[in-house]
Amino acid sequence: GNFEPVICLQLYIKIGSAWEKEDEAGFSHFMEHLTFKSTVKFPFNQIAAYISKLGGSINAYTDFDCTCYYISLPSEFVMEGLEVLAELAFHSTFTKEDVEVEKDIILEEMVQNTLDPETNFLQFVQDAAFTNYPLKRPILGTKESIKKASYKELRDFYHKYYQPHNSFLVIAGEAEF
């Protein structure tokens, strides 16, 4: 049958919970939330709708060693997908209000995680296995670190780590550039 060639774009930022300083606990995950808010070319919450209109999907995740933004879309829109990833990674315009809104969302996410037996078990194993290592830190951070996180601290974190020399791009699929 007929099918449309699809491409997957993954942009990795080399910062995750294991590389955060103690007072930055959860900042990598916080960035994952904030970068989607708005960018120079995509005002408030328009990124997902734009990718969807192109027939694609976009998401992100934070891990111990990286934060990954990924897009799957028809290959003919590879340049549009790359533009969106560049906007997220290097041109985010999140605001003080965005920080406060996302704080509440992340704190609620923490509550939901405490209700999940699998998440609790994995955190227990991490705590036991990595007693003196940064891998012990929860990806979401701590209630204290998230509550006290300021707009300036998060903005500084973004500008420090969200740099071309601290990222890499993976492209899978068929596309012409």
PLM regions with names:
Residues G1-Q46, E83, R155-F177:
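His/Glu-rich zincin catalytic helix
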Residues F44-F177:
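Charge-rich, well-structured scaffold segments of protease-associated domains
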